[in-house]
Amino acid sequence: MERLGQPAYRSRQLWQGLYRDRIASLDQFTTLPIPLREELKSSGWAIAFPFVQKRFTSTDGTVRYLLQFSDGQSVETVWMPEGDGGEQGDGSEDGPSYDRATICVSSQVGCAVDCQFCMTALLGLLRNLSAGEIVGQILAVLKDENVDVEKSRINLVFMGQGEPFLNFDNFVKAVTLLAEAVGIPESRMTVSTSGIVPRIVDFGQLAIRPKLAISLNASNDESRRELMPITKKWTLEKLMSAAREFPLRNRERMTFEYVLLGGVNDSEQNAREVVQLLRGLRAKVNLIAWNPGPEIPFSTPDPQHVEAFQQILIDAGIPTFIRKPRGRDIFAACGQLKRTELVTLS
């Protein structure tokens, strides 16, 4: 606006319209004079909300959005009303009110990390999302759900498609916009990483910093290398060293997520090894029983194994929660995002 010779309040009007009122086109910007709107258009300025290509609704109220960008690429964003099954990293259930919800956000189209238990890995990495595209997902979902962030408690989890720390700069810009412009504080955001050690260090230095969750999923290097090939580059020793040096805030705990695969990483011995890994850390653990998907050769663990695993960690003094699956019937649960149009499990 300054380059166009406009007063400062025009920038505030634009900011308010984009991020708070979620205006989807310049023609709808009635707070701006028509000549200014035309000047913005002629200079190439445009608003491009992601297009809601498909919407799938689960029996539990979860909605999986397939959102398309201007280049034709699409990602999934998940809306979880009335609680998130522990997605915020504390295992708690939100109150029975539509005024509380969680949005699971993608940071890339596809993913390069190649976790063997995750359907997104089958896509490979197609491209990074810009900061605007990351924020645009959230604005599109809030607009579609007709939610006012000033009247509702909205949590964000960067746990959709992609590894946020492999698109770090755009992720950080998006977080800043979400906190300062959209009005969702970083205390209501959680980002999950597969263990990009240098970026964990960088993340700890940010002034505006969401909560951190580390996707662990194995209790030793041998198992983790097979399940998460990124371990070949950053071993558990390096990952846990970064976790121990991470500057936690007062009363903050680092979350470790652990996807339990039947007969693979769900034994009592695995649980005891996790206890040793986390010893001395101010940590909590979210256990996730694997959510099935086609072309993925694993099985969901026996519920008794999940509970036994949890009890060993609790007995060791580690707060441990079993995350309830949300949207499993529409392929919206953890590890199921692959831009599929399937809505029921075979």
Swiss-Prot record:
<keyword id="KW-0819">tRNA processing</keyword>
<dbReference type="InterPro" id="IPR004383">
    <property type="entry name" value="rRNA_lsu_MTrfase_RlmN/Cfr"/>
</dbReference>
<feature type="active site" description="Proton acceptor">
    <location>
        <position position="76"/>
    </location>
</feature>
<dbReference type="InterPro" id="IPR013785">
    <property type="entry name" value="Aldolase_TIM"/>
</dbReference>
<keyword id="KW-0949">S-adenosyl-L-methionine</keyword>
<feature type="binding site">
    <location>
        <position position="291"/>
    </location>
    <ligand>
        <name>S-adenosyl-L-methionine</name>
    </ligand>
</feature>
<feature type="binding site">
    <location>
        <position position="118"/>
    </location>
    <ligand>
        <name>[4Fe-4S] cluster</name>
    </ligand>
</feature>
<keyword id="KW-0963">Cytoplasm</keyword>
<feature type="binding site">
    <location>
        <position position="192"/>
    </location>
    <ligand>
        <name>S-adenosyl-L-methionine</name>
    </ligand>
</feature>
<keyword id="KW-0479">Metal-binding</keyword>
<comment type="function">
    <text>Specifically methylates position 2 of adenine 2503 in 23S rRNA and position 2 of adenine 37 in tRNAs.</text>
</comment>
<dbReference type="Pfam" id="PF04055">
    <property type="entry name" value="Radical_SAM"/>
</dbReference>
<feature type="binding site">
    <location>
        <position position="111"/>
    </location>
    <ligand>
        <name>[4Fe-4S] cluster</name>
    </ligand>
</feature>
<keyword id="KW-0004">4Fe-4S</keyword>
<comment type="similarity">
    <text>Belongs to the radical SAM superfamily. RlmN family.</text>
</comment>
<feature type="binding site">
    <location>
        <begin position="215"/>
        <end position="217"/>
    </location>
    <ligand>
        <name>S-adenosyl-L-methionine</name>
    </ligand>
</feature>
<dbReference type="GO" id="GO:0002935">
    <property type="term" value="F:tRNA (adenine(37)-C2)-methyltransferase activity"/>
</dbReference>
<keyword id="KW-0808">Transferase</keyword>
<keyword id="KW-0408">Iron</keyword>
<feature type="active site" description="S-methylcysteine intermediate">
    <location>
        <position position="334"/>
    </location>
</feature>
<keyword id="KW-0489">Methyltransferase</keyword>
<dbReference type="InterPro" id="IPR040072">
    <property type="entry name" value="Methyltransferase_A"/>
</dbReference>
<feature type="domain" description="Radical SAM core">
    <location>
        <begin position="97"/>
        <end position="329"/>
    </location>
</feature>
<dbReference type="GO" id="GO:0070040">
    <property type="term" value="F:rRNA (adenine(2503)-C2-)-methyltransferase activity"/>
</dbReference>
<dbReference type="GO" id="GO:0000049">
    <property type="term" value="F:tRNA binding"/>
</dbReference>
<feature type="disulfide bond" description="(transient)">
    <location>
        <begin position="104"/>
        <end position="334"/>
    </location>
</feature>
<keyword id="KW-0698">rRNA processing</keyword>
<dbReference type="InterPro" id="IPR027492">
    <property type="entry name" value="RNA_MTrfase_RlmN"/>
</dbReference>
<dbReference type="GO" id="GO:0046872">
    <property type="term" value="F:metal ion binding"/>
</dbReference>
<keyword id="KW-1015">Disulfide bond</keyword>
<protein>
    <recommendedName>
        <fullName>Probable dual-specificity RNA methyltransferase RlmN</fullName>
        <ecNumber>2.1.1.192</ecNumber>
    </recommendedName>
</protein>
<dbReference type="GO" id="GO:0005737">
    <property type="term" value="C:cytoplasm"/>
</dbReference>
<feature type="binding site">
    <location>
        <begin position="162"/>
        <end position="163"/>
    </location>
    <ligand>
        <name>S-adenosyl-L-methionine</name>
    </ligand>
</feature>
<keyword id="KW-0411">Iron-sulfur</keyword>
<dbReference type="GO" id="GO:0051539">
    <property type="term" value="F:4 iron, 4 sulfur cluster binding"/>
</dbReference>
<dbReference type="GO" id="GO:0030488">
    <property type="term" value="P:tRNA methylation"/>
</dbReference>
<dbReference type="GO" id="GO:0070475">
    <property type="term" value="P:rRNA base methylation"/>
</dbReference>
<dbReference type="InterPro" id="IPR007197">
    <property type="entry name" value="rSAM"/>
</dbReference>
<feature type="binding site">
    <location>
        <position position="115"/>
    </location>
    <ligand>
        <name>[4Fe-4S] cluster</name>
    </ligand>
</feature>
<dbReference type="GO" id="GO:0019843">
    <property type="term" value="F:rRNA binding"/>
</dbReference>
